[in-house]
Amino acid sequence: MSGHSKWATIKRKKAVTDQKRGSLFTKLVKEITIAAKMGGGDPSGNPRLRLAIDTARSNSMPMDNIQRAVKKGTGELEGVIYDEITYEGYGPAGIALIIETATDNRNRTVADLRHIMSRNNGSLGESGSVSWMFQRKGSLEVPVSAASEEALMEALLEAGLEDLSNDGGETYTVITDVRDLEAAKKALEEQAIAFENAKMDLIPENYIELEAEDARKVIKLIDALEENDDVQAVYSNMEISESAMNSLED
């Protein structure tokens, strides 16, 4: 999972910029609204909504905003109806991309994505063209200061732990089956071990390792996609080499 951890490091740094763009709250509101629409407005009985609310709160979204988003999802307040659509394609150096969107206008979204991809040496593919390369997993991150690797293993062994990795950075990356993410969160809470960025993730079966030049191109494309208000998440099978990581962090 080393590639996942390295890319996670880049994404954590990008998140600060994303929030400044004002796009983060838009994406979080959409996720809360969709989760409430699909599974009801009670987070205790709706794991997706509970996760969305936890993510919003960890990013300092006011409770009023969260509650309005929930009520729009349940129909208590009038709101936009979003469709969830997943697109697949390729970026520079043959990197596989999965783009999850929430949109009120499918034609606008696909036109925007085609434009972004074509301007950044990428292309959209057919449904199923790259999704077979990925598996849906639960993931979360634990600061290395919060627990030792041994303590994490012990806490999570009976809570669905599938993979635990650290690339020498400031966090451990924990991977679980999607059905075990809540159990993993609960296990860490019971041991008073701090964690962050708990989410459903798409993990590639295999990675393509890139050097700095190609990695920059892929990151530029992913940045452009994530700036689009309809895009909720972008996943890739990019792994960044050690030398490229050092170059990108300079």
Curated annotation (Swiss-Prot):
Record GO terms (molecular function):
DNA binding
Instruction: List GO terms (cellular component aspect).
Output: cytosol
Instruction: Output the superkingdom of the source species.
Output: Bacteria
What range does the record give for the signal peptide? none
Q: Which Pfam families match?
A: TACO1_YebC_N, Transcrip_reg
What keyword terms does UniProt attach to this protein?
Answer: Cytoplasm, DNA-binding, Transcription, Transcription regulation
**Principal location class:** cytoplasm
State any GO BP term from the record: regulation of DNA-templated transcription
InterPro entries recorded: Integrase-like_N, TACO1_YebC-like_2nd/3rd_dom, TACO1_YebC_N, Transcrip_reg_TACO1-like, Transcrip_reg_TACO1-like_dom3, YebC-like
- Where in or outside the cell is it found? Cytoplasm
Identify the Gene3D superfamilies for this entry.
1.10.10.200, 3.30.70.980
The UniProt family comment states: Belongs to the TACO1 family.
What is the designated name of this protein?
Answer: Probable transcriptional regulatory protein Plut_1643
Q: Which organism is it from?
A: Chlorobium luteolum (strain DSM 273 / BCRC 81028 / 2530)
